[in-house]
Amino acid sequence: YLSWGFSVININYRLANTALAPAAVEDSRCALYWVINNAEKYSFDTTKIVTTGFSAGGHLSLTTGIMSPETEFDKQCPSHDLDNKFDNKKVKVAAIVNWSGITDVEDLIAGDNKRNYAVEWLGNNITNTEIELAKKVSPINYVRSDLPPILTIHGDKDTVVPYAHAVKLHQKLDKAGVVNQLFSVKGASHNYFSKQQTQQIYATIKEFLIKHQLI
């Protein structure tokens, strides 16, 4: 990304062993506010913000990029203007590059694809309260027509974050008329792409960003 002319901000967020959901979502949203509020200081172009991440980072790149400025997860941000003087029109991204990200948290705690790591993130004791929170932090539930372009990269043999999550998001985005692309990595698991596959992935990302005039 640096070689493509981007300024890169690699954020830290609270993990499950430090704070349960929705802390990571809040931290990532706050990072977006920080970027926008510090754009002049660091010469960031806020019309070309791209969120990206792998696995949990893919999930957070989606939630950060597609939630509306009025979301409850912004309220704890130090830079959030509680008097509503902040220009909400600026709180948006130009594109999202999602690598193997979770799209439906509810599915991972109470659905067909239940995973222990997701249950732990919600606090292990899953009640209706946790299920409602899972819905709120699921990117699939924020799909609407005015979203930025989204590129999803996912191995079709991924069993950690089911490949079905990528397919489901792609289908729902298509139905809503959102510009998006699903790059399926054939035979790839969750945490391994071959050198050739990695080269293909980055070529696809670059082509995607050029297409949307972000490079």
PLM ranges: what are they?
Residues 1-215:
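Alpha/beta-hydrolase superfamily serine-hydrolase fold, recognizing
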